[in-house]
Amino acid sequence: DLIDQCKIFHFGSVSLTDEPCRSACLDAAAYAKQQAKRISFDPNYRPLLWDTEADAREQIMRGIALADILKVSEEELLLITGTADLEAGSKILMEKGPSLVLVTLGERGAFYRNRTHAQLIPTYPVKAIDTTGSGDAFVGAMLWSLKDLPEEELFLGDLSQIVDFANAAGSLTATRGGAIPALPSIEEIQVCRQKKIGIL
């Protein structure tokens, strides 16, 4: 019922490390795709959770094959594609199935590519206290912004403002301690974007 009611089904590779969670997660994602839900995948690679890098790469590729929206870090881009080049790496990932690829770059911002646009969006200057949860804030803000976006605009449109919104969410999260308690409100993100600085 939860999958039937959702607009976006999001998962990561932590749930792909072992059975039976692996099969359950992949089956759920495949079912969501059959129901025409948007599928979002964030590898969130944690080396200590995997027996080998090759095993991690194999399972991550299974997740990517199901995804419409893919978010990776710079390190994951290199792991999966063999290149750290944003242009080349994002093109390789697009060929694997996703129609929107996002690469988070820490203090440099985020790069996105869909079928017609590719752009690096700078982030907001902050005094970082704890970066825990910044990536999750970025993904959450992205998916919140994309959940009602028409498919044509999602995969063909200019998403620079949406990525900027997500960058602001990630930057603000880094200015506070903890993970969930550090997540900013929509109002705080909007103020951050208006001031063009991540310190409120």
Walk through the language-model features, giving the residues of each.
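Conserved phosphate-binding/catalytic region of the ribokinase-like
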Residues: 30-34, 82-200
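Structural motif
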Residues: 7-8, 100
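Short amphipathic alpha-helix with an adjacent loop that forms part of the alpha/beta core around
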Residues: 1-4
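Conserved beta-alpha-beta core of the PfkB/ribokinase-like small-molecule kinase fold
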Residues: 8-91, 108-109
